[in-house]
């Protein structure tokens, strides 16, 4: 007869009417009993021919990922002027005095961050934007391109200008100034002199060296200005001679991707020095130099739009090397859906290319990408905005994968010990936290994203559009791109993007200037950065608590008024070093902090409501007597494992599932096992904070017997049959807890100390987890253990009772270190009587 749930519950000693523990508990360690129960509950690994279930509720196997939904109305989030100040360390020292070694080490890691993988694979530009949404390919292309442009404008990306140069927007760092193109020493060596250099207030100089140097910078680029082969021979000064060998001939570009260039651009390049030095009046008097408004940064760097679009339109009629977009202007419409109808909507489509406020030299950067990008919803609760997903998975795969640095994350007990208190809490939201941390420019060639341009993207997607080299640039080939779908998509996009359609239709290559989210190094760097900042804050305000995990920062103080004062001071400090906070998303939690999926109060910690709701939904949809794919079991265990510490039997209850996942076998839920798990997860118990105390109860065991020392009382007992030593030690600890009720127990067994009961016989592990719940263990060496003699049957010998203090720990976590307090000569940071006379330390 199958084992019913009440019988199973009684067997696990979860009911009050169980017999004496010393008799009942050792039975649970019996292998035969564990095997029979597993057979009754159908927990043996099934060898069944029934097809596996690959979906349970929202859980699917890892290989059947849900298709993301495209939203044509996605908004691109705005990125504020994120610029982490380079003098961050000196500002922290002004705020709190000398920094500790830990803080200095962590802050130096990210000023700037470095990333140099062993091997980097380069992919063609067509793989730059992933075709995740085939039905909305053009829309997705432009939205992604707009997102990348926004990041570049915000100073988060470099734009590859040529094989060895890049431009960027925003405030420069000192290491970028060292790589600056127009540094005086460089030009003096080259013999260009300094008369063509504009002194910049920021220390970065705009690239204005004369004539051919400027020209060569664009000529060598596959994405910038390119001339016919004959024009390249003109450049004889500067570096253009060296660069000529690397130039790709324009004929390699299919139609629609050829860089914009006309005969006039040669003259423009030769006049570049004088162009940069024109006054504003001369600019206005000479509008042919640029049809778009010139942008001026704080450093007065002038954006140069190299090709006057009007001239391109007039000269490009039969030119192979004209801009693909503007070629349609004078073309005869091929149909009602010809792109020429859209191109003729505007007289001025703006520049083909934009260049940043500052130029720097970079290591050799090929015209390729190292990762693809696509858009998804910003998060499940915000589907109006998009988020850019960058796939740099090449660095985590294969034999050349990068082994990312590991860092400790606080476990549940450590987190509860640290944060479970009677403080008032609030959490801060750091805007685009990853994009605060600067990356060394030498890492740019390893982290490239971009797009191949609209024409090549469309040609790749449409079956009837083929690119032939011998047809390159002919009108017939030009109209191969025209289609109803493309026409309608572009017409709709024209409403929102306007003349940027032209800019975005050109190819571009961008490299990361700040750390990207898709690389395993980034979480490590972010965790080190925020934990160092929190350490500084804790030392400045020793009567308060600041803690962080990744970009989640929490502040705690004794009263609401004190917390508000702390919030103002900390916010001002963070803003002063360039950390951008989203103040509208600041959450005030009162006394129950919501953090890392937990609710933490003075009573302990519990999972947040949305996780409890997910678990209930999971059990509601869980089928019985049906083989469930082990990959789906992984998802189920991931959810249940998060809440396991809050249940009676904890992780051991999930061991049958773990076993089937390890064996890559399907798992069948029997009604009894499902009822057992369901009951476990419907009643969750808080994990309480450990409190310091004195250990006065000790346990020890041998394979044949157990012994306890409870105060001055000694007890001993024997097992019916010899047991493995770890099992015997665990039983002794359970007896000590049940007989004394003490929540601090001394033991000399490391496995019991670890409180991981998953390696014991299954039934014993489940029962022991419930008996020892909330118990703290102290290590006592065997030679000093007062319970050692009773366990060996010697009751007459009394060793002196040790005074073993137990001190809760915040775990081996790199994210929290006890910070020494601030030197006393610094002024007090909170300008009113603090509610505490002594410095508050985490419990």
UniProtKB/Swiss-Prot annotation:
MF-aspect GO terms: DNA binding; DNA-directed DNA polymerase activity; metal ion binding; RNA-directed DNA polymerase activity; RNA-DNA hybrid ribonuclease activity
Region (Disordered): 284-308
Alphabetized Pfam families for the sequence: DNA_pol_viral_C (PF00336), DNA_pol_viral_N (PF00242), RVT_1 (PF00078)
Site (Priming of reverse-transcription by covalently linking the first nucleotide of the (-)DNA) residue list: 63
Activity-regulation annotation: Activated by host HSP70 and HSP40 in vitro to be able to bind the epsilon loop of the pgRNA. Because deletion of the RNase H region renders the protein partly chaperone-independent, the chaperones may be needed indirectly to relieve occlusion of the RNA-binding site by this domain. Inhibited by several reverse-transcriptase inhibitors: Lamivudine, Adefovir and Entecavir.
SUPFAM superfamilies: DNA/RNA polymerases
Entries under InterPro entries matching the protein: DNA/RNA_pol_sf, DNApol_viral_C, DNApol_viral_N, HBV_DPOL, Rev_trsase/Diguanyl_cyclase, RT_dom, Viral_Replic_Matur_Polypro
Stretch list, region Polymerase/reverse transcriptase domain (RT): 347-690
Region of interest (Terminal protein domain (TP)), residue spans: 1-177
Entries under Gene3D superfamilies matching the protein: 3.30.70.270
Coiled-coil ranges per UniProt: none
Limits of the Reverse transcriptase domain: 357-600
GO biological-process terms attached to the record: DNA replication; symbiont-mediated suppression of host innate immune response
This protein's UniProt keywords: DNA replication, DNA-binding, DNA-directed DNA polymerase, Endonuclease, Host-virus interaction, Hydrolase, Inhibition of host innate immune response by virus, Inhibition of host RLR pathway by virus, Magnesium, Metal-binding, Multifunctional enzyme, Nuclease, Nucleotidyltransferase, RNA-directed DNA polymerase, Transferase, Viral immunoevasion
Keyword Ligase found: no
Functional summary from the UniProt entry: Multifunctional enzyme that converts the viral RNA genome into dsDNA in viral cytoplasmic capsids. This enzyme displays a DNA polymerase activity that can copy either DNA or RNA templates, and a ribonuclease H (RNase H) activity that cleaves the RNA strand of RNA-DNA heteroduplexes in a partially processive 3'- to 5'-endonucleasic mode. Neo-synthesized pregenomic RNA (pgRNA) are encapsidated together with the P protein, and reverse-transcribed inside the nucleocapsid.
Family of the protein in this entry: Belongs to the hepadnaviridae P protein family.
Notes on the domains: Terminal protein domain (TP) is hepadnavirus-specific. Spacer domain is highly variable and separates the TP and RT domains. Polymerase/reverse-transcriptase domain (RT) and ribonuclease H domain (RH) are similar to retrovirus reverse transcriptase/RNase H. The polymerase/reverse transcriptase (RT) and ribonuclease H (RH) domains are structured in five subdomains: finger, palm, thumb, connection and RNase H. Within the palm subdomain, the 'primer grip' region is thought to be involved in the positioning of the primer terminus for accommodating the incoming nucleotide. The RH domain stabilizes the association of RT with primer-template.
Additional remarks: Hepadnaviral virions contain probably just one P protein molecule per particle.
Name of this protein: Protein P
Annotated gene: P
């Amino acid at each position: 007869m199958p084992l019913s749930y009440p019988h199973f519950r009684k067997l696990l000693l979860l009911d009050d009417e169980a017999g004496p523990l010393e008799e009942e508990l050792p039975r649970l360690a019996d292998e035969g009993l564990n095997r029979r129960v597993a057979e009754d509950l159908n927990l043996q690994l099934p060898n069944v021919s029934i097809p596996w279930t690959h979906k349970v509720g929202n859980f699917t196997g890892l290989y059947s990922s849900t298709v993301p939904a495209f939203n044509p109305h996605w908004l691109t989030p705005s990125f504020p002027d994120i610029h982490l100040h380079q003098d961050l360390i000196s500002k922290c020292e002004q705020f709190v005095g000398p920094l500790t070694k830990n803080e200095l080490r962590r802050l130096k890691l990210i000023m700037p961050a470095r990333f140099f993988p062993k091997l980097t694979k380069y992919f063609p530009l067509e793989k730059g934007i992933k075709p995740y949404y085939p039905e909305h390919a053009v829309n997705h292309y432009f939205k992604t391109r707009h997102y990348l442009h926004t990041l570049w404008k915000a100073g988060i990306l470099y734009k590859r200008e040529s094989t060895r140069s890049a431009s960027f927007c925003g405030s420069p760092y000192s290491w970028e100034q060292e790589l600056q193109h127009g540094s005086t020493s460089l030009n003096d060596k080259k013999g260009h002199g300094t008369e063509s250099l504009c002194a910049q207030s920021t220390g970065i100089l705009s690239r204005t060296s004369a004539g051919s140097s400027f020209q060569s910078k664009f000529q060598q680029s596959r994405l910038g200005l390119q001339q016919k082969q004959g024009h390249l021979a003109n450049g004889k000064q500067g570096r253009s001679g060296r660069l000529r060998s690397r130039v790709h001939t324009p004929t390699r570009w299919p139609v629609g991707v050829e860089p914009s260039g006309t005969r006039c651009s040669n003259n423009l390049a030769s006049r570049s020095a004088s162009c940069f030095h024109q006054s504003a009046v001369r600019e206005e008097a000479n509008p042919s130099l640029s049809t778009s408004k010139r942008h001026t940064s704080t450093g007065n760097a002038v954006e140069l739009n190299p090709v006057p679009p009007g001239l391109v339109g007039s000269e490009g009629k039969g030119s192979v090397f004209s801009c693909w977009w503007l070629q349609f202007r004078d073309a005869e419409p091929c149909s009602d859906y010809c792109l020429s109808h859209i191109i003729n909507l505007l007289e001025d489509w703006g520049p083909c290319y934009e260049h940043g406020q500052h130029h720097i030299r970079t290591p050799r950067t090929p015209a390729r990408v190292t990762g693809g990008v696509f858009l998804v919803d910003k998060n499940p609760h915000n589907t109006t905005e998009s988020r850019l997903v960058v796939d740099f998975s090449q660095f985590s795969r294969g034999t050349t994968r990068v082994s990312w640095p590991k860092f400790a994350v606080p476990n549940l007990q450590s987190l509860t010990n640290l944060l479970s208190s009677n403080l008032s809490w609030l959490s801060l939201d750091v805007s685009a936290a990853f994009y605060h941390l600067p990356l060394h420019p030498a890492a740019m060639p390893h982290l490239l994203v971009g797009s191949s341009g609209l024409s090549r993207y469309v040609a790749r997607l449409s079956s009837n559009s083929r690119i032939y080299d011998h047809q390159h640039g002919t009108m017939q080939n030009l109209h191969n791109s025209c289609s109803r779908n493309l026409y309608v998509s572009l017409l709709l996009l024209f409403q929102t993007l306007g003349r940027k359609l032209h800019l975005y239709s050109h190819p571009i290559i961008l490299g990361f200037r700040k750390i990207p989210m898709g690389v395993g190094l980034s979480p490590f760097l972010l965790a080190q950065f925020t934990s160092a900042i929190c350490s500084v804050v804790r030392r400045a305000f020793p009567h308060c608590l600041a803690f962080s995990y990744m970009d989640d920062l929490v502040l705690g103080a004794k009263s609401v008024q004190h917390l508000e004062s702390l919030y103002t001071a900390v916010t001002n400090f963070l803003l002063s070093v360039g950390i951008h906070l989203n103040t509208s998303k600041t959450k005030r939690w009162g006394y129950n902090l919501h953090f890392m999926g937990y609710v933490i109060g003075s009573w302990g910690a519990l999972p947040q409501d949305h996780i409890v709701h997910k678990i209930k939904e999971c059990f509601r949809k869980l089928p019985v007597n049906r083989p469930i794919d082990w990959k789906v079991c992984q998802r189920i265990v991931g959810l249940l494992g998060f809440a396991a510490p809050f249940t009676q039997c904890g992780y051991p209850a999930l061991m049958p599932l773990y076993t089937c996942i390890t064996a890559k076998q399907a798992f069948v839920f029997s009604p009894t096992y499902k009822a057992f798990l369901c009951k476990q997860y419907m009643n969750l118990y808080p994990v309480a904070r450990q409190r310091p105390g004195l250990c006065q109860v000790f346990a020890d065991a041998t394979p044949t017997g157990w012994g306890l020392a409870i105060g001055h009382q000694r007890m001993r007992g024997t097992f019916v049959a010899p047991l493995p030593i770890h099992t015997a030690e665990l039983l002794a600890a359970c007896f000590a807890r049940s007989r004394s009720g003490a929540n601090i127990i001394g033991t000399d067994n490391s496995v019991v100390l670890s409180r991981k009961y998953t390696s014991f016989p299954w039934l014993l592990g489940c029962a022991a987890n419930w008996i020892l719940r909330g118990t703290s263990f102290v290590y006592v060496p065997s030679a000093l253990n007062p319970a050692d003699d009773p366990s060996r049957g010697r009751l007459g010998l009394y060793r002196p009772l040790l005074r073993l203090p137990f001190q809760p720990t915040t775990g081996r976590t790199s994210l929290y270190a006890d910070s020494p307090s601030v030197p006393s000569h610094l002024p007090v940071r909170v300008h009113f009587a603090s509610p505490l006379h002594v410095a508050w330390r985490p419990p």
